[in-house]
Amino acid sequence: VPALGALAERIGDHILVTHSAGGFPGWMSAMQNSEVKGVASYEPGGFVFPEGEVPDRIDGLTGGVAGTAVPMEQFKRLTEIPIILYFGDYIPETPSKNLGDENWRVRLQMARKFVEAINRHGGNATLVELPKIGIYGNTHFLMQDLNNAELANLLDKWLNRQRFLTKQK
């Protein structure tokens, strides 16, 4: 996270894009660096919650996932920036014997709780489950799947809705 902070200071205002295990350091960086003006995260693997509001651990065959407590003062920073999370296909709603599926099942469940927590505290977080909007076939490496241009267009539309791609006066 210190390296992300140094990079943030060097490049200035930016939108942070994270993937998988990079999601957790992304949340930490966004909480610590005012230069982070938004976060787009592809299937993040870890999540932060305000102290006293960490949901119960979600167990699964791969060990499950637990939220990480942070002071409310830090968490509130996530409520001040737009955040979007994308999750791909092949993620079951019920426990699976396929370890990869199971790993992302519990993380998607925790992502839902994370987005709900941010929005409950006045934030602007969105969770996009691609199959629910008619986009199928994505693996965990969404950005390199055959429909990566379609996913890039989704991100572009979000950036425009957040006014990141328009000149600010």
PLM-predicted stretches and their roles:
Residues 16-17, 39:
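Conserved alpha/beta-hydrolase fold motif
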Residues 137, 141-169:
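Catalytic active-site module of serine/aspartate enzymes centered on a nucleophile-bearing elbow/loop
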Residues 28-32:
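Active-site signature of alpha/beta-hydrolase-fold catalytic machinery across serine-
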Residues 33-53:
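A conserved short beta-strand
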Residues 128-137:
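Short glycine-rich catalytic loops that host catalytic nucleophiles or stabilize transition states
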